[in-house]
Amino acid sequence: MRSKKGEEDMRREKRVSDSSVETMHAVRPVHLNGAGRLFGGQLMEWLDEVAGLVGRRHAEHNITTASVDNLRFIHGVYLDEVVVVIGKATYVGKTSMEVRVDTYVESKDGMRRPINRAYFTMVALDEKDKPTEIPGLLIETEEEKWEWDAAKKRREMRMKRREEGF
């Protein structure tokens, strides 16, 4: 499978696994809000960092965050819990890409409970901070194809919202 179906795309392609990133964070007192749970802004920082690392690995350029979709907090996170943040590219355009970031709390026995999922749009920048072309994305599995198709739908919705001034 290829990133551009029906078109000849001469760009070099990279696998999803080439740029995937996983980080872990121990929740400390400095990360907590007044209710004793992980501060949402801290989690957003970790998500953005992982999305940026995925983007940088894929694009091999500096990256900026253009937008975040579907940022939903499913469960709270508490002191001394371990947060696992996993990012991967789901869609690649000419200069931008979508990065899916999943977040889990990992228990002491290694079991992971999902707490968050978000989709970031990242744009690659050249030395003059202008958008620059990036490698294509090689789609190899049915799951990656499903993610690609879903990402295209989300992209269309973002474009429509932009046209509406939102």
Language-model segments: residues:
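A short small-residue
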Residues: 25-31
